[in-house]
Amino acid sequence: MRILLIHSDYLNYNVKNKTPVAEEIEDAKKQGAFDESLVVFTAVEKDDENNPQGIVKNLVKEVIKTNDQVKAENIVLYPYAHLSSSLSSPKVAVQVLKDAEEALDAEGLNVKRVPFGWYKAFEISCKGHPLSELSRTITAEEEEEEEVEKKPSSWSILDGDKIIDIDDFKFENDQLEKLVSYELGTGASDAGEPPHVKLMREKELCDYESASDVGNLKWFPKGRLVRDLLADYVYNLVVDQGAMPIETPIFYDLDNEAINVHAAKFGERQYRTDTKKNLMLRFACCFGAFRVMADPFITWKNLPAKLYELSTYSFRFEKKGEVVGLKRLRAFTMPDFHSFCADMNSTLEEFSKQTDMCIQTGVDLDVNYEIIFRATKDFYDENKDWMYSIGKKIGKPVLLEILPERKHYWSCKIDFAAIDYLGRPIENPTVQIDVESGKRFDITYLGEDGKEHYPTILHCSPTGSIERVICSLLEKTAIELDEKAPMLPTWLSPIEVRIITVGEDHKDFANELYDKINAENIRVDVDDRDESVGKKIRNAATEWIPYIFVVGDNEKESGVFSVTVRETGEKVDMTVDELIKEILDKTKGMPYRGLPLPKDISTRINFQ
């Protein structure tokens, strides 16, 4: 927001004609005369739509601060579009000015607001002293930071049902200690490039696309496969939980009041479009799910109702300098699972189940999560026994944050975070209790009492964004490099088995083995190149392939192969049937997709 503050002897105005965006006004507001006034010429800007409440707070703060110095009898809010070339929507601008008028009035000031969207003739007499003409740029960030400082959260460790002061807690887990330090502002900074950025390129998963916006990636066949497998995995998880899959638009109209308020609550920077409509690219699937649920007739018998959408993509307009690798992007893939619950008991029961699901993803993905359990003080006081039961379920110490009051749409949430090589959290799964959106989006159900009620909503992402899952897996390999060979879980490895031929006359047999292994839904390829066996083995190792074996005369004759098992570093003699059984046992219950590349390495494109 841009403002120009004029301390004036008087301001007179007369309304002349409407513009297309003029607000409706009474005749009494078509003219005005104010003596001894601080006139605040205002232009609400496009960026202000991200957090209009923060803009109002800081505008009011600046006006009060200036008026304390000049001691004007009246405050006049005067909309003046000429202060900026990047204006907000008229709807947002009017609401900001109305809210500012109300807030200044609540402070005991004599405040008037000049009509928005009208051509006006005006006359003003500036007093001419050093403080009589001031220009300011109003943003929301300073006020948000100040608010946090005024009312800090309380932090402790929850270990089962025991609350332990952080200063008294003996950390046996350095990953939890790093998470605590980061959350309290004493941990690793966000400077430095994490190892996964190099690895995502080396392993031909993905890379930056210079012809696009920053934070938008291009995905190569191997990376696309890993993303798709993770998406399949989450789909299976949530459908088992009773979710109904949906698909909704990626664009939403910020002139829709419910969407505008929810977007402001979310607090992330958003992609906006410069069109006739005030459109925003979604930052999550919430809007779509809520609008789907606002239309049908729902009764208590239908609840809990669960909707799932994989957003390809969601968008957040992160600062250019903050965008890094797979961890922080402007376009990303987010599994969004929403549950609509009839009452708090049902909500807590579903929250517990979804916490179990998030814990299971850590096991299935072989990612170690550290956990932050967050709640408002009111929620904690009312539900502390239930929170302790969740602590026991988790089975290890977690960081507990108690907020003095609710600042967002949620009253309680649990966040799971992997820790990267540099000691910084990668936020992954989450479950959140939303106590606002049911009413805001007019989602109702008919209760057993015959009355309409608003449901409580659970937001859950069982893995977090797909990109951050891959980020976590790659960072884990860097952390454990001194302990074991880096690799992805077998079911996520783009190539699970590589067959290496000794010579040209072994290719037919290698192809027979390929056909047999491939028929069992195992991703297998053949290194048929005219290279030494040693070089082929080294190349397979750089691709982190879980199982490698060589086909020569002896193997062809005996049917027994010396298989290099990457996970253990051992060479194990086994038949093809034994190899197939081991892999199928290891990947049981996990999704499968076929090899995303030509089976013969000699025909492949190198994407890096």
From Swiss-Prot:
Pfam families: HGTP_anticodon (PF03129), tRNA-synt_2b (PF00587), tRNA-Thr_ED (PF08915)
Gene Ontology molecular-function annotations: ATP binding; threonine-tRNA ligase activity; tRNA binding; zinc ion binding
Highest taxon, organism lineage: Archaea
Sorted UniProt keywords: Aminoacyl-tRNA synthetase, ATP-binding, Cytoplasm, Ligase, Metal-binding, Nucleotide-binding, Protein biosynthesis, RNA-binding, tRNA-binding, Zinc
Cofactor comment text: Binds 1 zinc ion per subunit.
Annotated EC: 6.1.1.3
Stretches for region Catalytic: 195-489
Record: residues binding Zn(2+): C286, H338, H459
Compartments it resides in: Cytoplasm
Phosphoprotein among keywords: no
One GO biological process term: threonyl-tRNA aminoacylation
Keyword Zinc found: yes
Location of region: Editing domain: 1-144
Entry's Gene Ontology cellular component terms: cytoplasm
Function comment: Catalyzes the attachment of threonine to tRNA(Thr) in a two-step reaction: L-threonine is first activated by ATP to form Thr-AMP and then transferred to the acceptor end of tRNA(Thr). Also edits incorrectly charged L-seryl-tRNA(Thr).
Family: Belongs to the class-II aminoacyl-tRNA synthetase family.
Domain notes per entry: The N-terminal domain is an archaea-specific tRNA-editing domain that hydrolyzes incorrectly charged L-seryl-tRNA(Thr). Catalysis of tRNA editing is performed by the charged tRNA itself.
Subunit structure: Homodimer.
Protein name: Threonine--tRNA ligase
Organism (species): Methanobrevibacter smithii (strain ATCC 35061 / DSM 861 / OCM 144 / PS)
Biological classification of the source: Archaea, Methanobacteriati, Methanobacteriota, Methanomada group, Methanobacteria
Gene: thrS
